Amino acid sequence: MKRRLSLALVATLLAGCGQQAAPTAAPGTGALPADAAAVAAERGLTADDVYAAVSTYQPSGHMDDYILFSSGGQAGQVFVIGVPSMRILRTIAVFAPEPWQGYGFGDETTEVLRGGDMPDGTELNWGDTHHPNLSETNGEYDGEFLFINDKANARLAVIDLRDFETKQIIKNPNSLSDHGGSFVTPNTEYVVEGPQYATPIGWEYAPVEEYNDKYRDLITFWKFDRVAGRVDEGQSFQIELPPYWQDLCDAGKSVSDGWMFCNSINTELATGGVEDGNPMFGCSVIVNP
């Protein structure tokens, strides 16, 4: 089908490039109408360009086949994008106030935002969102909830997909940064917040010379109450890891159900001082054998 359409488009485009009047396409032939062919020729579009355009175009009143949840990075929110149109359908406010949609400026949303403040009461009004993830049933996406992490401040947010609004933000009590996102176990019993950089546990200070002894990573398993649509902090737990740097963590499925997988970098425990003989950070080393 694509090949037949492409051939018809090529013929039409060639006619347009030759400045010849193209006849109106007959219904069902796959050829472009004359006015559309003229636009394509004027812009120098190839048959593949035109095919890509018509593959993604969605007229008003037509729904996309899929929706994509994209992290907003240091803007601290989540974008909802239609696929294949790639239109932004909604911006979900999460870790930062957004005056234009009233988030963080009323009692209800302010309470949600303040739930993610620092343990000492310092307000956090920004975030760095990474790796959103959907809730699952039997290892398949069920579209009920979306979870998103704040890499900069080690926080987790719960978004209810009945109304596409943030319902809960939690500050990790022991971690300073995360990256492993907010992946879930096969039936969303737990939301898994993976760590990134090792730090002293409990907000204590330790010099880098004590890195191996005092610095640790933590994988946090947040217990999720699906009925309440909230994380139950009292039933959650953490696993202590060596002070490697973790990237992404996710739960196994099917034959690997019951296992958790997390990839690591900087297993050399590099902290600088290469010129003094300390380990080099292997991720950036190029070896010439």
Segments and roles (model prediction):
Residues 18-26:
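Bacterial lipoprotein signal-peptidase II cleavage site
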Residues 43-48, 87-92, 120-126, 165-171, ...:
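A short beta-strand motif characteristic of beta-propeller blades
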Residues 71-117, 148-173, 226-230:
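Beta-propeller domains
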Residues 55-65, 131-133, 143, 193-216, ...:
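Short, conserved, GDST-rich strand-edge loop motifs in beta-rich repeat architectures
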Residues 13-16:
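C-terminal motif of bacterial Sec signal peptides marking the signal peptidase cleavage site
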Residues 78, 154-157, 200-201, 219, ...:
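Structural signal for beta-propeller blades
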Residues 64-66, 143-145, 187-189, 256-258:
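Short coil/turn segments that connect the beta-strands within blades of beta-propeller domains
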Residues 51-58, 98-106, 123-138, 174-186, ...:
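Repeated scaffold domains used in trafficking and secretory/extracellular systems
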